[in-house]
Amino acid sequence: MIFGLLYGLGLRVGEVSRLCRKDVDLDKAVLLIRQTKFGKDRLVPFGPRIALAISSFIERRESGLGPIPPDCPVFSFAKDKQKRIRPTTISWTFHKLLPELKLVIPAGVAQPHLHCLRHSFAVGTLLRWYRAGINPATRLLDLSTFLGHVSPSSTAVYLTITTELFECASQRFAQFAAATLKEVVR
């Protein structure tokens, strides 16, 4: 569930670690992310698949440990419901699980780190916009706000070009260039 929130919503590991039960509103399908990296709070909406996953996780946890009090962390250790799972523990677990994925990492390329899930969310969002015919430039401020960045320039750092993203951007540019060229020739 933790990795699903990191990848599926582009949350920072500390934000997931600090989530309390009162921060999860399943009826409104929104998370309240408190005291982000820049000391602000933000609301992060989520869709039906993530809603189902969160709901199922909370139900399973409560069936084993009892109700989660509002101020208790969503992700805690079984022995102590008050003790949240620390970001370092989440990162350590991620690195322990990496070999299970059997990723082929080319020589000279660094092994993925936990924050790559956030980068993947940002790039995936751009890809979805391209495929839906949405101009990403008009929505970059939305993505920046969603990720809790102070400006779109902070978000741009996350937007690593991938082959798939390059192909989508190239197709969009080719369409733009063809339309512009037709008007110039007239």
Language model segments and positions:
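Conserved catalytic core of the tyrosine transesterase superfamily
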Residues: 1-186
